[in-house]
Amino acid sequence: MRPGTRRRSEPRSEKLSEQIARQVLHDIEDQKLTPGTQLPAESAMCERFNVGKASVREAMRILEINGLISIRTGSGGGPVVGSTDGRGYGSMSTLHFQSMGATLRDLMNARTALEPILAAQAAAQPGTEAGEALRASLECSLHVSRTDSLRFASSNSDFHAVLYSVSGNPILALMARALRDIWSVRVESVMLPEGERHEVESAHKRITDAVEQHDSQEAERQVREHLEFYREFCEENYPHILSDVVEWW
């Protein structure tokens, strides 16, 4: 079957490589393939789609550059399903951010607008799973020494990642993870001193409490205040970094 014959409608005329990429993406979706799953070899795809190697390779490149697959080298290598952690989406986004001249200040403002929405949705989730997941992440972070800057930053980032994941909104969660990942590229240059880290821990506790109590308004407020605190700290101490244009990575 040639890639253009699938029953799903296509929004425009596509190159063969784009049709192949779209079909492979449908396969991943339909078969519920998980990250790391091996995809068919190049020769098998050429035979299936009745196309040459160039079209298949271009299709794989389209998927790879968007973080949807990765290419393993060596024995047993080939295309595998990529991770859904948001880094691929984030990398693609930085191309657009750089082209429009968006700064890290713009990115921080976007996080401040987006994450409170996710917190409110997390608190609105039925049952106890959202609160339990956040509580577990919080407890892990409390064991990290405040004097270890890199580990503290990593545990702080992990807490926010859990908050996104329990929101019940996969699209906004993906966007938030992407913005967080773009920001984390500069995390070694933007470190909270030990004195301010206590406030971060306290904020995370208040956020967790609000989600556990299913208090959406309070969860939203706490996350907004938490990020505004961090943004103000960056404005006071690292304004030059916030003025930097986001670069493709």
Positions of predicted regions on the chain:
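Short linear motifs at protein or domain termini
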Residues: 1-113, 120, 124, 241-242, ...
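Conserved amphipathic alpha-helical segments that form helical-bundle/coiled-coil interaction surfaces
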Residues: 107-189, 200-208, 218-233
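C-terminal effector-binding regulatory domain of bacterial HTH transcription factors
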Residues: 2-7, 217-249
